[in-house]
Every structure is written in structure tokens, then in C-alpha cells.
Amino acid sequence: MKRLINKLHQEQMLTAEEFHRLLANRSEETDLYARELANQVRQEVYGNKIYVRGLIEFTNYCKNDCYYCGIRRSNQNAQRYRLTEEDILECCRQGYEIGFRTFVLQGGEDGFFTDDRIVQIVRKIKEQYPDCALTLSIGEKSEESYRAYREAGADRYLLRHETADPRHYMRLHPLEMSGENRKSCLRILKKLGYQTGAGFMVGSPLQTVDDLVEDFLFLKELDPEMVGIGPFIAHQDTPFCNERSGTLDDTLFYLALLRLMLPNVLLPATTALGTIHPRGREMGVLSGANVVMPNLSPVSVRKKYMLYDGKICTGDEAAECRMCLSRRMERIGCEVVTDRGDYKKRLA
């Protein structure tokens, strides 16, 4: 298997059959080898810099009914909330003061936030903080909507594809949702010049090795600037409430493969990774990740944005989260930096 890992490192690509062999025949030794190699690649491209993104979860209303998600529309137990424009700008103000230069506006697909409202919020943030990057993560929209946000000043867009296999996608989502539509959205985002982020759940219900092969092949074809992966964690108020979580080892191995396949990618060590293991985010960085995303949302709403059970850091103030992550990264020889942390284009 080391031969395949070396090939992925050198050529940044494997065939479907090679990916299948690599994913189906793992050992502790090959996992560790891939993770150490990916950590070297991260250092070669980005040094020991770890980029922070200030996450603002501004609405937990959602029109979708994804079977794995705690803010799905059918969840009658979810305490719904929306931040006002003033709330969002105050989160940015606090974040800016403590060093954040990228803000991520994330929310469910909430019809209250029309294109006009989103455009106005984007414009105000970019007017007040012109040196900052702004990322949106608000789901599937039309090309016209994506263009309007881009023209207003949005720099990046996160839209996890969740699974690239159409049959698996149908098992995780209701019939009105389409994996092909999500892929189409990602291609439109790339075309419009966004730094684009895709990604998948690790260990989601009914996930097979074949599904994972499809994920890696799709990500190679899309060539996104960002990839977000994290372990599936069940939420008590969803149809998947009794399903087992994705594992730490799987997530770390797939992070490593992504770094080897897409050496310049911006790769978060997610909150979900920190939820399944106390040092999950540090281990993610040592497996090739180079982004962390502390929460800037008001503490009063943090516990309401529960996509999965047991989410960490719901009670800490933003400054505490920032300092805690800085200390954690320093202990593993890395430095949390306050610049925009843009994608580094590969030299031809």
C-alpha cells in the first residue's frame, strides 16, 4: 500500500481501482505513513501556518430535510433562531478585534434571507472590513443568486457534496434533493470565480468503499480550493439517531489522502473531529489539515445550531476559542495566523 501512497504523492492521482485497493486494504502502518507524508506536504506548501476562519452560524431554519442533520425542517425539537444584520456585523466586529481576517457566514437554506438580504449583508461586511475574506455557506442556489453574492463581494463558498455517489446520496436525502444538482452548483461556483469548497461525511450511514472512491475521483475532477470532511455524528432527533459515528482513524487517513492528492488545498480540521476526540483537531493538522474554524456566533445561540449531538465549544466566548486554539496549535509546533489565508495556486 505504501507504493500507492507514494504514487498519489508523486502524481496526485490514482485510478479508481487503485483507490479501491488503498481504501480497502489499510493497516495501522500505512495509515501512519500517509499521515506523516501529508504533514510534510502541508509544511512544504503552507509552512507551519494554520489559518483561522471565524464561523458565524446566522440561521438554523432550513427548508431541507436531510436525514442526518439536526436542523432538518422536520425536527420539531429544534429551537429556531435568526441573527439580525446588526447581530452578524457585531460578530464580525468582535472577530476583527481579536484577529480574524476571514468570516464564514453559515446557515440553513432559509427563505427569509432573500438574495437582496444576503447581498446587503455581504456588502456591509466588505465595506467595513475590506481587508477580510468573506465565505458563504448557505446551500444550493441558482446561478443568478451565486453571481449576485459574488458581485457584492463574497470571496469563497462552501458547499459540501456529502457523497458523490448518486445512490448513496438518495439514501441520505429526501427525494426532492439531487446529488447532481449539488455537483452542478459546485461547478457554477468554480466558473464564477469563487474559491470553492466541497467535501463529504466520513462514515455516513450505508457508506461503502465504492462510495469513497467516487468522492476522491469527484474531488480530483472538481479541483476545489477547499475541502471539508468530518466524521458523521448522529443527532438524536433524526432518522439516523441510532447509527454509529464515523471514526477518528478514517477521518485522519482521508485528510492525508486529500492533502497528497490536492497539495495546495485549504483543508480544515473540523469541529466534528474535535468532538469525537479531545485532540482531534491537532491530530487533523498533523495529518495534513491547515485550517481551523472557531465559532464567532453569540453564545446565546450556539447550542441551537446543533447539526449533530455533543458539539464542542458551544459555551466559550469567541476570544476564549481563539486563545484555546492558538495554544493547542503551538503545542504541536504550528502557528495560528491572522491573515486571509487564501488558496495558493499551483505553479505550472
Could you describe each region identified by the protein language model?
Residues 113-138, 177-195, 243-265, 317-329:
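Alpha-helix-loop-beta-strand connector modules within alpha/beta enzyme cores
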Residues 142-149, 205-218, 275-286:
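Catalytic cores of alpha/beta
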